[in-house]
Amino acid sequence: DVYKRQRLCLQAALQVAGDKKGFGILCDSRLGQEALFTAADTGLWVGRPAEWPGSRPLEVEPDLGADFGRLSEWPRDQVVKVLCFCHPDDDHGLWKRQIQTVKRLFEACRRNQLEFLLEVIPSKAGEIDDMTTALVIQRFYDESIFPDWWKLEPLLTVAAWRNVIDAIERNDAHTRGIVILGLGESEEKLGRSFSIAANYPLVKGFAVGRTIFADVAQQW
């Protein structure tokens, strides 16, 4: 079942990591509660989603409570991850609503001494060019939202990556860095993005589960 698959994925991550630093998982509490418990104090970086899957405008998991008070129960070494589907061309009303939700969650993370990861995927909300992701990032900074981590789609040009890095470094010298998401893309396409991103120290790693194990998981 899906719960056993989550446990197997965690076992694989722990086996590969061994005693080395720099490995981690993304795991939600609805399907992966046992894996989250097991991952505690293992040294793995643990990102835990807070969004209601697929929501646009953004909605947060009801389990967090109306004031996100349940975050006080999260272990301090878990990173609060939220995915916001947004695009520079979104109308004012949509931006306002999504900004309000993201800012409330960001502030709740600060109150509870939890790191905050903001994931944005503009390509799922409209056409993109080399400035699109950078403009989205700037929009959140303009609203005094300073994520500890950014999770960004695999950009394919030097210009797009340079614009993103400039936007982050211009606004926040203390951000932890960037994690690249996979979107289920081919290894070839991700490799092209990684080869560019590897030139920037701000890019810390990637989370591309479907590309790595989707076929195996389906067969299993």
Task: Label the predicted regions.
Residues E119, W150, G209:
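Conserved, mostly hydrophobic/aromatic
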Residues E153-W220:
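Catalytic-face loop-and-helix region of soluble metabolic enzyme cores
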Residues V2-Y3:
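Short, small-residue-biased leader/transition segments that mark boundaries at the very start
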